[in-house]
């Protein structure tokens, strides 16, 4: 690729988006009072990956999420044998579910949002069959009922020949001790990082820009189109085993800056990291981004941060392994001004580089 290319140039510029999100959050806080007659919002979940309210003796959580542009890579490398839309369906569900469960919620119902420019998009039987199968299988993996959805035709908004995929979900937290917020975070907590399965659904616009420059588009497209992990069963297994989860951060947009998502002043010290998969190395080489820019944009091999007391680390890692995932006892919380320090990379992300709340 000629010259350096950044994610903000070809995809999302968070410096212009995040302030508007904060503005909306501020306005939204004025509506919490509308929950009455036995309903009460959990205020500390505003600005988290999922919103929680108390409902009688239980807590409920809700979320809405979108896939982004990963489906455009499936469209680009489609061949006679594969549409790749089973992976696309799976990953859309994964983006929704992995946000929902970060507060301890057990998924209940999930609704689809598939926006198209023209109904012709729906007439591709192979693609639709794969999308529906991937979506269904992912819901089964997450333990969620696919309750329905919306398929709007939006001429003039959606680009012809494409689809905007997203959805919403609701989950239940059966008791207060299973509710996960940042309230329990304390200096000395350990940070467990879970190994990602690759790019997941973030930073795809830059990946697409890289793909366009490569001779072997299919080979790169294949490693981009790996399924994201779904952690719904794992989180419930950890809670069932009475692991004292103090916080969870889903590492998506903003890369490893997301480790400090909690609105608290701690130094997040990361001593060990998983090796980035090949897809990240190709993106870095072709885009010209330096290591700090890559770790500030992508998950770079780790996509979930689970915060637990040191006494629970060994047991938690055993449960993670039994669920088929890999984890690292990666670091710890230290009292101090909010920042993430990646020690082995000599990279520091100051608190101001993640301003979501």
Located regions from the model:
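Acidic, glycine-rich loop-and-beta core segments that form the ion-binding/anion-interacting portion
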Residues: 184-222
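Glycine-rich phosphate/pyrophosphate-binding loop regions near the starts of catalytic domains
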Residues: 28-197, 348-351
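Short, well-ordered alpha-helical scaffold segments within catalytic/effector domains
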Residues: 90-94, 204, 228-232, 280
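Active-site pocket-shaping loop/turn-to-helix segments
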Residues: 82-90, 221-230
């Amino acid at each position: 690729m000629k010259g350096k290319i950044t994610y903000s140039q070809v995809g999302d510029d968070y410096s212009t988006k995040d302030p508007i999100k904060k503005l909306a959050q501020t306005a939204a806080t004025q509506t919490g009072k509308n929950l009455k007659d036995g309903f009460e919002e959990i205020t500390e979940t505003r600005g988290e990956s999922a919103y929680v309210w108390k409902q009688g003796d239980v807590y409920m959580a809700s979320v809405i999420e979108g896939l982004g542009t990963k489906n455009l890579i499936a469209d680009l490398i489609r061949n006679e044998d594969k549409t790749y839309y089973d992976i696309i369906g799976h990953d859309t569900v994964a983006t929704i579910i992995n946000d929902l469960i970060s507060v301890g919620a057990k998924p209940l119902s999930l609704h689809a949002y598939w926006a198209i420019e023209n109904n012709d998009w729906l007439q591709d039987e192979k693609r639709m069959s794969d999308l529906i199968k991937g979506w269904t299988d992912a819901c089964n993996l997450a333990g969620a009922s696919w309750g329905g959805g919306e398929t709007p035709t939006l001429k003039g908004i959606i680009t012809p020949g494409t689809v905007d995929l997203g959805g919403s979900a609701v989950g239940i937290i059966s008791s207060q001790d299973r509710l996960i917020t940042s309230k329990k975070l304390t200096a000395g907590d350990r940070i467990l990082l879970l190994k990602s399965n690759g790019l997941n659904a973030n930073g795809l616009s830059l990946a697409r820009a890289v793909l366009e420059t490569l001779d072997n588009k299919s080979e790169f497209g294949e490693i981009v189109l790996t399924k994201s992990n779904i952690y719904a069963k794992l989180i419930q297994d950890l809670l069932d085993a009475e692991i004292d989860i103090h916080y969870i951060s889903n590492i998506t947009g903003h890369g490893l800056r997301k480790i400090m998502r909690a609105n608290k002043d701690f130094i997040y010290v990361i001593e060990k990291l998983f090796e980035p998969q090949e897809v990240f190395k190709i993106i870095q080489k072709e885009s010209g981004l330096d290591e700090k820019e890559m770790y500030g944009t992508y998950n770079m091999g780790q996509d979930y941060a689970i915060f637990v007391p040191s006494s629970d680390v060994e047991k938690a890692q055993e449960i993670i392994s039994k669920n088929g995932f890999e984890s690292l006892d990666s670091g710890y919380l230290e009292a101090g001004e909010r920042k993430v320090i990646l020690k082995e990379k000599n990279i520091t992300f100051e608190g101001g580089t993640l301003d979501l709340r």
